[in-house]
């Protein structure tokens, strides 16, 4: 009896091959779809990472889009100098030049126009004189004792440029803007043949209840921590150290049953600010048991260990840690490249293709 297949058997074999092929194609397609969740406490740099994705993986911000950030730049600048002046009263710091008190009064009167996207020569002059004052600088140097935008010095030192009538914010100016994220911001881009959907979720406590429905089918979590927060308290709870809050949040995410099979990538962010701050503000403010030196390398490594030690599944779950500066495009590009390689490897493994 011969081994020739009947027409029916041949059709069944072809069908089987087609099903296998379709399954493989579906597997490869699934391996190319990446859902990234950006988590972390408020002001840890999540939204800046999203802006960097637009700069790196899309065409960046058009001139028209940059113009729309002008009002935000002015608002951030005004709010920064106002925060410093208000703190001077609380910290009992006097102006170096007593006549600056008149400028401060004038600033409060003129602030509204600049908040709406106009920076008159009068407002710019007032801010410039105040920023140069020795008392204002002394208060700025004590900014850990009150809430101040990270980009305060960036904008205030560049007032001549941003106060020009022809001013259009640069990509870097846009990266530095601070607007509290409310709700969920979704970004799509393609990189290394992967289709990314990135979700940026508000970090303040009031925003966290909105995270839960993003959890389904997440490929990886990027958890952002601001290294420079080690000596600060929360804007929404002045009793709580920001780093301790971040650790508490990371513990709940890292060991959550939802994320047993999810890659967790830890971005220890604002390394530039941390490197400056650690020279004058000891790590023992946050970790009283810390016995190392207040050098960037040693203090940063200690913080890394504090977070990685929270992982209760060390045998089966790896935390991929990177030190980042979210406002530095080259640094974010380099780190995201490494992150993508990890995602590709883990994705292929999950789809049985590795």
Curated annotation (Swiss-Prot):
Record region (G4 motif): 265-272
Lipid-binding residues (covalent, N-myristoyl glycine): 2
Protein role: Guanine nucleotide-binding proteins (G proteins) function as transducers downstream of G protein-coupled receptors (GPCRs) in numerous signaling cascades. The alpha chain contains the guanine nucleotide binding site and alternates between an active, GTP-bound state and an inactive, GDP-bound state. Signaling by an activated GPCR promotes GDP release and GTP binding. The alpha subunit has a low GTPase activity that converts bound GTP to GDP, thereby terminating the signal. Both GDP release and GTP hydrolysis are modulated by numerous regulatory proteins.
Entry GO terms, CC: cell cortex; centrosome; cytoplasm; heterotrimeric G-protein complex; midbody; nucleus; plasma membrane
Enzyme class of the recorded protein, top EC level: hydrolase
Name of the protein described by the UniProt record: Guanine nucleotide-binding protein G(i) subunit alpha-1
Positions of the UniProt region annotated as G3 motif: 196-205
Region (G5 motif): 324-329
Protein location: Nucleus; Cytoplasm; Cell membrane; Cytoplasm, Cytoskeleton, Microtubule organizing center, Centrosome
EC number: 3.6.5.-
Keyword tags: Cell cycle, Cell division, Cell membrane, Cytoplasm, Cytoskeleton, GTP-binding, Hydrolase, Lipoprotein, Magnesium, Membrane, Metal-binding, Mitosis, Myristate, Nucleotide-binding, Nucleus, Palmitate, Transducer, Transport
G-alpha domain: residues covered: 32-354
